[in-house]
Amino acid sequence: IGGAGYTAGELTRLLINHPEVEIGFIHSTSHAGQPVSAVHEGLLGDTDLCFAADFDLNAVDVLFLCQGHGKSTQFWAEHPLPDTLRVIDLAQDFRDESAGYVYGLPELQRQRISGARLVANPGCFATALQLSMLPLAAAGMLPDRISVSGVTGSTGAGVKPGSTTHFSWRSDNLSVYKPFNHQHLAEICRSLKGLQNGWDGVIDFVPVRGNFARGIYAMTWIHTDMTEEAARRLYTDFYATAPFTIVAPGEVDLKQAVNTNKAVIGITATEGRLLVTCAIDNLLKGASGQAVQNMNIMAGFDETAGLRLKPSAF
């Protein structure tokens, strides 16, 4: 539902090639009747599907909601939820786990996701920042104040054009937006508080608009006496069973993660400070790829099915 946006396009690309999936319909009110490849031009030659005006929720096993934030609540007010339907919502409406939804960050809640019918997919920045901090929270090592900055590509703003996504403005440019009050902070803090009992700290998060199309590069730093070796061991052990979260042996760059479902984490410690970097593709691990990962877990498929993607090296 909501098939014309960037996340829906990436979701379609992944599901077309998924070994266990047959797409029932791709709904779009604004593009009903048009070929999907006329909107998502990268799918030319890969699918003959057309956008549907109507749909039958009883005819599918899993529904992905790719509408704008706030529209999911309205959707369920207008459509009864079939008893057997599994739902993965990419909007932020139910990330607080209201209405029976489970928060869908596999590295945090894999077991709960496996038994869930309703999953709320995390936000893109929320994914990168949580993966940067979850091991510290699990070890009870989060300080009262955490400094974070992250640079995101223009696709994070969605498919609808705006003044800050216009090429002439975005190219060769950087700008801060929503400093200290980004909407993803709520879901990040909720997860951290659940892991580190009694933590009620502050995250000073400064998001930055980058002059590239896709990807997030997040930098989190705290004051701690932990050595780099100990920090690397902590993160490696925490993510030992996470197939897409990788602790890199050296420095991390964005191209290691873009076009994949990976979260690539870098660890640097010096003189009482720890820096954790995290690179993800905002449209994949930050959205559609993670949604497919959640579907795989919910359905009992191989968690990596349809997601074995290689980054572009150059």
Question: What are the roles of these predicted feature ranges?
Answer:
Residues 176-180, 208-210, 253-257:
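Short Gly/Pro-enriched turn/cap motifs at secondary-structure boundaries
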